[in-house]
Amino acid sequence: MTDQNNNQTSALRRADRLSTVVLLASALLLIGLAGRVMWIQTHVTRADASSLHSQHDVRVTLMARRASIYTSDSTLIAGSVRVYNMFADPGYIFDPKGTLNALAGAQLIASRRIMAKAMARVLNENESDFLPWLKSRLYYANGTLRRFVWLKRGKDYSFYHHFEMVKHGLIAKSRQALRNHHPALAQEYFHALDGIGFILSTRRVYPLGDFAGQVIGFANSERGLNGLEEQLNSLLVGRSGQAVYVKDAAARALWIKKKGYRLPSDGMRVWLTLNTTIQQIAQHELDKAAKQFKPRSSVAIVMNPWNGDILAMANWPELNPNDYQKTPPNFWRNRAVTDPYEPGSVFKPYNLSWALKNHVVTLNTVFNTYNGRYRDPTGRLIEDVGGWPSLTVENILVYSSNIGMTQIGWKMGIPMEYQAIHSFGFGQMTGCILPGESPGMVRPESQWTKGMETSVSFGYGIAVTPLQLARGLCAIANGGWLPTPQIIKAVEVSPGKLETWTQIAGPQPWKKIVPRSTEQLVRTAMEQVMVRGTGQYAISPLYRLFGKTGTANLAIAGQDGYHAHQYNATFIAGGPVPNPRLICVVCVHEPDPHLGHFGGTVAGPACSKILTRSLQYLQVPPDQGPKTDPWWGKEALLKRLKGLSH
């Protein structure tokens, strides 16, 4: 028993001595480290300190997510998704100087063979192609070793997951080789995919494809390049954040420093005024018209005349922002605002409104229309194929008489006609924030010459955009108020907090330009255009609509005069007549003249169908619809329209 106690005592003493030795050694080590730190603090230069800091601190950018864009009914039309971009480090993989790779010699060669087989599975390519392709990119043209080359970009998670599964399979084989006492083989499997990596980024996607493509535009992962994506870039892009993390000697992240850390701020989500269903209706009908009449391009706009909201803005040919490179750049622009043109007879209601407002005429005023041949005060010959001896002002609009409108224009005079154009917003920006908008072309009043009264009275000698036509038509529909067209409904200014565009940009100007009574008269005449005039092909079976046709010859670029067989066909309409809910403008540019070219027959049906289907969607109760005048029925209409420009 005594021996056992002695043994235990000896063991404890040895443990105490060992602890003392360890403690003394630790103390000496700490003293040495403290001394070293003091020496560094007093002797290391500023450059050395910066070098040490850079070796241990890594700054990374925390990307902000580009905000999404929605329709007014909260359908996503532009958003960002995470994508995986695969790269390779050829210099590391081939390691020509033997200083970079974890393996060397036969092991490196064997590991590359494993890599080739694995990457063939990942990339779905031939095993024999990968390494030769990569080796051909080992050096830059100047002989510098290349350390980075893209393999695949913009891939989704399934691609990344497939790579990770292949990699995990190689790691499993490495472990199995270790268990089987083959350490060299284990290393070859373990390091086989060294030098292959991923960089995470985002890609802009457009779930509805060509939905309002020219309006939305397109963007890359960083900024908007076209359309509203570009125009609203400062709202959508957000602000990137930053993190500073400390790494160890093996470049492994240890922790993130509090100082210098900044969370990213995502962009502000935007809701547009576009209605998903009405936009799709407009695009569908525009596409049908394009297939039937083979135009160069066409545009359709639907607006709410009471608040100026643009509910649809369609362009044909359409643009799919997901594959915008496949569409010629000429069709990237939004022609509803960028391309002014001479509108032809659809311009007559605006002039007539001003003449009625200023009591120059009434709807019952009768004009001699000279059986279809008339010379204006400058001697210019004006013709109406209809050949009417005389017409009331209402019928001048109904049958689109250029002779009648010429006389009204001359009765108004240049100052009043210019005032009409300016008051309806032509020749000036609409105030809408859509990019690339043209103000159109209206000569200053001082530059008007005698004879301009004639041209402008039926829509020549000026150039307007489809959006300007739609804006002016809103005033005819809503009782005389010229609105500012709206394309943005709301913006999420902070998480969960929406503000209307009016709250952000301030009240949008509206201007009272004509009395309600005047526009009621104009709508009455425009309804008769549909019932017994040039708009009969645009009659709705469900609603009383008011409208106007326009067929304009194209001017010869750089010369005086017009093409004989190139046209722009336009139709403007709204309804229902008693209380208009919507207005619509359809412009069909350069339809095949062998298939049709009149505004009433080419653009009219599309315009009417867009309005009818949209009003049905909004659950507007149908009225009985008008009956056509047998004298001006559709068969007679085709005969009478032949050769007319209206």
Regions found by a protein language model. Give the residues of each.
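Short, small/polar residue-rich loop motifs at catalytic or cofactor-binding pockets
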Residues: T61-R65, S240, K294-S298, N368
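Small/polar-residue-rich segments within soluble enzyme cores
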Residues: A78, F87-A88, Y92, I114-R121, ...
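Soluble periplasmic/extracytoplasmic beta-strand elements of cell-envelope proteins
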Residues: R66-T71, T75-G79, V83-D89, F148-K152, ...
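Short, basic/aromatic recognition patches
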Residues: A47-L62, I278-F293
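Solvent-exposed, polar/charged alpha-helical surfaces in well-ordered, non-transmembrane soluble domains
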Residues: Y84, R113-K117, R121, H161-M165, ...
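Beta-lactam-recognizing serine transpeptidase/beta-lactamase-like catalytic domain environment
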Residues: T2-D3, A78, K247-Y261, S265-G267, ...
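Hydrophobic alpha-helical transmembrane signal-anchor segments
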Residues: D3-Q4, R13-A47
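Juxtamembrane extramembrane loops of integral membrane proteins
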Residues: V60-N124
